[in-house]
């Protein structure tokens, strides 16, 4: 099946014939998002690439007129951005890749959906500024992470990407234009909230709509002051390059503790003291992947048992100061906390890797290395609540996780979860990451099975540990844990998308 010729022509008249395609060998590329996704999605009927907000509006209005369902993509890195049903149109935003403004005085940047982390990050660094960079690598869309997800390693001193969302331009599911925040009153991009009720929470809550409520075509994001160098110093060549920072103002520490409760207490106290650019309990198996250059190197390191011994109950701390004196103060406070709670430094060979390469904290390209094992990996949890709540969630992981390990479905890494505090401990994010082998006949079912068991465990304990995925059956299952949000979500969807054309989901 393909789009009717008359509809195809309407769409081609909007963007030009060179920016729409329905050839099957091209559409095949849009059935897959990443290697670990074993679901066989249908091909879209066509892919179209607008270059402006006006063109996006025109496309959406054609879709409503002919009842054609659509979804939006940028980098195709995540689990979304595919045709969730047969007969859909994919709207690729890659041509809309302009940095429209970087305002150094009011500290915001205005961007389009196709702008990648690797485009924007160096530009703001040059100006002594930075922004929360989602832990997804350099090729990912900045806008997508601000309106959908966006967790990262340095949330201790900042927050999730969503908290930095300012004014934005939104094409509703019916093709109308809405300008949100100060932009609505023609007062510029600087503020997310204008007079009266705010619509920022309509575009996204803790998570976004996965394309289910129209298309955000421009956003402004808040910028922070950057304590690092304006031009990143690099040494070596890929994949063994390094990004060292001046050691008089930047230091990395990793401490191991007797139990997860001790890790939690140290994390809380560092938040109270408001120290650290980054403070987190990180994945230990993923860390081994990040700091090795081949699968063989990974297995040699992992089988040595070093990371299992040193990093199962560990806390990563990155301190940075404007001056050596500021750094020295934070370091003294940190050591007081660590010594009081019973922590001790991990093996020097582990910490040295971070001291030599700060990419982990600035997220230039290091994270792409998790794909190199050649198998699959997938996340579970991805929720947030208090620090204490997240550690209770972590302690419950063995209840369902060991079964998969014993059946040899996943890597034996039960502590491969991260907990990242936000805003100096006002809340925290958790993510459980697991690796599996594509050589297993049933590998496409493994991620779904782990996710299902994880959600069941959350429901059993009443944990707020998941970002409910955009699947109706799962949102209805989790809804009672989250103030019956699914009922409000459905009402909003019906009100704004009467034709149910904006990514209705599976």
Say what each PLM segment does.
Residues 20-24, 49, 70-74, 91-93, ...:
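General beta-strand structural signal in soluble alpha/beta enzymes
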Residues 51, 254-261, 316-325, 382-389, ...:
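Short beta-strand-to-loop capping motifs
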Residues 100-102, 113, 118-259:
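FAD-binding subdomain of flavoenzyme oxidoreductases
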Residues 10-34:
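Conserved oxyanion/phosphate-binding beta-strand-loop segments in alpha/beta enzyme cores
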Residues 6-9, 37-38, 42-46, 58-61, ...:
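Conserved glycine-rich FAD pyrophosphate-binding loop
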Residues 204, 220, 231-240, 246-258, ...:
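C-terminal cap/substrate-recognition region of VAO/PCMH-type FAD-linked oxidoreductases
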Residues 31-130, 141, 145-153:
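Long, structured ligand/cofactor-binding scaffold of large enzymes
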């Amino acid at each position: 099946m393909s789009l009717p010729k008359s509809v195809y022509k309407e769409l081609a008249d909007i963007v030009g014939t060179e920016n729409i395609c329905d050839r099957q060998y091209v559409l095949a590329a849009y059935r897959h998002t990443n290697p670990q996704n074993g679901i066989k999605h249908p091909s879209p009927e066509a892919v179209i690439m607008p270059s402006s907000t006006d063109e996006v509006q025109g496309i959406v209005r054609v879709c409503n007129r002919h009842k054609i369902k659509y979804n939006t993509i940028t980098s195709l890195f995540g689990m979304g951005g595919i045709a969730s049903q047969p007969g859909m149109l994919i709207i690729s935003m890659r041509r809309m890749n302009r940095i429209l403004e970087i305002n150094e005085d009011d500290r915001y940047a205005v961007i389009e959906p196709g702008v990648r982390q690797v485009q924007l990050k160096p530009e703001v660094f040059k100006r002594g500024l930075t922004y929360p960079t989602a832990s997804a690598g350099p090729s990912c869309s900045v806008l997508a992470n601000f309106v959908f997800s966006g967790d990262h390693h340095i949330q201790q001193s900042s927050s999730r990407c969503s908290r930095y969302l300012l004014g934005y331009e939104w094409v509703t599911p019916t093709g109308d234009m809405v300008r949100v925040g100060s932009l609505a009153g023609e007062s510029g991009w600087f503020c997310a909230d204008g007079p009266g009720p705010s619509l920022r929470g309509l575009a996204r809550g803790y998570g976004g709509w996965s394309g289910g409520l129209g298309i955000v075509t421009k956003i402004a994001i808040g910028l922070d002051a950057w304590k690092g160098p304006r031009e990143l110093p690099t040494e070596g060549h890929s994949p063994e390059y390094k990004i060292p920072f001046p050691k008089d103002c930047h230091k990395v520490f990793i401490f191991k503790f007797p139990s997860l409760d001790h890790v939690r207490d140290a994390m809380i106290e560092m938040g109270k003291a408001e120290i650290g650019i980054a403070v987190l309990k990180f994945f230990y198996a993923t860390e081994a992947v990040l700091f090795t250059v081949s699968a063989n190197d990974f297995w040699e390191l992992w089988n040595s048992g070093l990371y299992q011994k040193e990093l199962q109950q560990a806390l990563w701390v990155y301190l940075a100061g404007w001056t050596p004196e500021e750094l020295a103060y934070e370091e003294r406070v940190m050591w007081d906390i660590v010594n009081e709670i019973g922590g001790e430094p991990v093996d020097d060979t582990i910490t040295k890797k971070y001291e030599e390469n700060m990419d982990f904290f600035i997220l230039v390209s290091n994270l792409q290395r998790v794909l190199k094992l050649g198998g699959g990996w997938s996340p579970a949890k991805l929720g947030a609540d208090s620090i204490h709540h997240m550690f209770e969630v972590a302690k419950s992981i063995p209840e369902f996780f060991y079964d998969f390990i014993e059946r040899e479905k996943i890597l034996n890494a039960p502590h491969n979860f991260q907990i990242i505090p936000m805003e100096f401990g006002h809340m925290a994010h958790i993510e459980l990451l697991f690796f599996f082998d594509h050589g297993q006949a049933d590998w496409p079912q493994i991620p779904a099975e782990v996710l299902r068991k994880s959600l069941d465990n959350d429901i059993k304990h009443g944990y707020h540990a998941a970002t409910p995925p955009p699947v109706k059956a799962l949102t209805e299952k989790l809804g009672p844990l989250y103030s019956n949000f699914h009922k409000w979500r459905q009402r909003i969807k019906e009100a704004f998308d009467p034709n149910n054309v904006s990514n209705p989901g599976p």
